[in-house]
């Protein structure tokens, strides 16, 4: 199983417009964060999680021109608005890209981007969208899904299992439910939203995430969806063993 963090930043990215690096050292390349997205690959099957506004640059950096499916965690702009770039993936595949989203997210996508799913102006649809079930198999990847609180909406929490390796992905969450605990407990790698140190209404702060780590006991925890207050080197020095800041281009192969 190979996992690549395509983007590790929050909705504004780092630096924010105006060259705002906040507390992040501009000389550290791992502080430059595009909007959050993930790529999971196993035995020839590639799954893209979310189509961030930075998707084109993210896939170019990863040297990836084809994905076999897309899963959307939720309908917020920073996780969706690169959807038009799936046209190139459509051309690479030669057929509409299989896409999956929970029912509310799928409805929002169809409303905002009808042309992507129906075609328009003589152009064919580029995505074949299905409702994301609680369990899904894509190639040899077994995927389990739970609904996660994220302010007034929910996001899809994902667990990928293949070849005895388990990967959890929990972005855009505001609380930990029993279903989430069951999904993520003891995973080999847990990639989790950790927006900043100060509390936030719809994302977890660092102290909250570290409490979850103590409870869930993943083998390795990687922080993502971080804002300009979360300097890479500072986090590396501060975090306990087994917990690390993610960055754009972070990879693991197990």
Language-model-derived ranges and their functions:
Residues 1-170, 236-254:
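Binuclear metal-dependent hydrolase catalytic cores
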Residues 54, 76, 174, 195, ...:
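Catalytic metal-binding/acid-base residues of hydrolase active sites
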Residues 133, 177-254:
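Binuclear metal-ion centers of metallo-dependent hydrolases, dominated by the metallo-beta-lactamase
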Residues 152-155, 163-193:
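Active-site-proximal loop/helix segments of hydrolase catalytic cores
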């Amino acid at each position: 199983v190979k996992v690549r963090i395509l983007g590790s930043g929050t909705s504004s990215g780092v630096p924010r417009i105006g060259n705002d690096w906040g507390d992040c050292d501009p000389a550290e390349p791992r502080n430059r964060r595009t909007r959050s997205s993930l790529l999971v690959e196993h035995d020839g099957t590639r799954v893209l999680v979310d189509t961030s506004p930075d998707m084109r640059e993210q896939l170019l950096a990863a040297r990836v021109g084809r994905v076999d499916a897309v899963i959307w965690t939720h309908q917020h702009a920073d996780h969706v608005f690169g959807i038009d770039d799936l046209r190139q993936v459509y051309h690479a595949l030669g057929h509409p890209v299989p896409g999956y989203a929970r029912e509310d997210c799928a409805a929002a996508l169809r409303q905002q981007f009808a042309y992507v799913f129906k075609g328009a102006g003589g152009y064919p649809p580029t995505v074949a969208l299905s409702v994301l079930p609680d369990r899904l198999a894509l190639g040899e990847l077994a995927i389990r899904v739970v609904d996660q609180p994220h302010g007034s909406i929910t996001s899809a929490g994902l667990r990928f299992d293949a070849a005895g390796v388990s990967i959890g992905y929990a972005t855009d969450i505001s609380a930990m439910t029993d279903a989430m605990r069951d999904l993520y407990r003891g995973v080999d790698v847990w990639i989790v939203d950790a927006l900043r140190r100060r509390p936030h209404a719809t994302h977890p702060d660092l102290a909250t995430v570290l409490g979850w780590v103590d409870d869930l006991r993943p083998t390795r925890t990687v922080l993502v969806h971080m804002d300009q207050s979360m300097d890479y080197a500072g986090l590396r020095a501060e975090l306990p063993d087994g917990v690390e800041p993610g960055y754009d281009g972070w990879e693991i192969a197990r």
